Amino acid sequence: MKTLVIVIHPNLETSVVNKTWMNRLKQEKDITVHDLYGEYPNFIIDVEKEQQLLLDHERIVFQFPMYWYSSPALLKQWEDDVLTHGWAYGTGGTKLHGKELLLAISLGAQESDYQAGGEYNITISELIRPFQVTANYIGMRFLPAFTQYGTLHLSKEDVKNSAERLVDYLKAEH
């Protein structure tokens, strides 16, 4: 399955986990890696180019670090600009119907922090609900997220293993 991984990290050069994930994914022949901040540092998005990338792939992955319980700002801008009426939704807006969407999220906190009674008293499933609603609205199949918790405390080996698990997850049938 042709997979597009859209990497959304505003400081990718200083990243450990997301940069490792991205570099590992670039080695896969059926995975296209697209660095959104690298491509659009000024937030001026080439809508036609982005829409064509989506059309060329069956599985779309948003890869990002969790920032203030959400995704980095450029992803919201991308959604607003690229997922247009008449293309992604509304009359004639069926271009993404049947495609798959999943999230690959890195989080500094521990998994136990993201649950009822935890530090944040909310689950990741609840935090990513807007992505699920968007996927449903534009006719995409929303898949369970790939999450890596505790990224602030991972060893180099843990990061490498996380990248391998991500590759396996993206290649699996869901």
Curated annotation (Swiss-Prot):
Provide this UniProt record's keywords sorted from A to Z.
Answer: Oxidoreductase
Which InterPro entries does the record match to this protein?
Flavodoxin_fold (IPR003680), Flavoprotein-like_sf (IPR029039), KefG/KefF (IPR046980)
Among its keywords, does the record have Cytoplasm? Answer: no
Q: Would I find Zinc-finger among this entry's keywords?
A: no
Q: What domain of life is recorded for the organism?
A: Bacteria
Entry EC no(s): 1.6.99.-
One GO MF term, please?
FMN binding
UniProt similarity note: Belongs to the NAD(P)H dehydrogenase (quinone) family.
Q: Which PANTHER family match?
A: GLUTATHIONE-REGULATED POTASSIUM-EFFLUX SYSTEM ANCILLARY PROTEIN KEFG (PTHR47307:SF1)
Q: What is this protein called?
A: Uncharacterized NAD(P)H oxidoreductase YrkL
**Organism of this sequence:** Bacillus subtilis (strain 168)
